[in-house]
Structures are given as C-alpha cells and as structure tokens.
C-alpha cells in the first residue's frame, strides 16, 4: 500500500511539472496588431503570434495558409 501511495504522489508531481513547463513554453506576449492570418485549422487569427500561441497551447500543428482572413 505504501508503494502504491508513493507511485501516485510521484505521478501527480510529474504531471504537474510537465504542465508547468508547457505553460512557460507557451506563454507568449503577442501584440494587439491586427494583421490577420488564415490558419490551417480554418480559423482566422489576429496575427501570426496569436496563431503560434494557440497552436502551442492546444498542442496542435497549425500553420499559416495565407495572409488575410480565411
């Protein structure tokens, strides 16, 4: 039982640390400049930074299809 509890504590710590690293990596300071781009997910983003930030946070591969709205 002690071993099980120890494994649970270690697993929770590992998940928390991994999420913290992801949050730091994706924490981008994007400007409010409106230079729309069309993402490969079919959504219009206000600028390239916003697209990159969304892709990082959602852990998806979203690329710029073209400048301008979709």
From Swiss-Prot:
Tissues expressed in: Expressed by the venom duct.
Which subcellular locations apply to this protein?
Secreted
Residues carrying the site annotation Reactive bond: 32-33
Does Metal-binding show up as a keyword for this record? no
Please tell me where this protein is predominantly located.
secreted
Q: Which protein family is it in?
A: Belongs to the conopeptide P-like superfamily.
**Function comment:** Acts as a neurotoxin by inhibiting an ion channel. May also act as a serine protease inhibitor, since it possess the kazal serine protease inhibitor signature.
- Report the protein name in the record: Turripeptide Pal9.2
The organism is Polystira albida (White giant-turris)
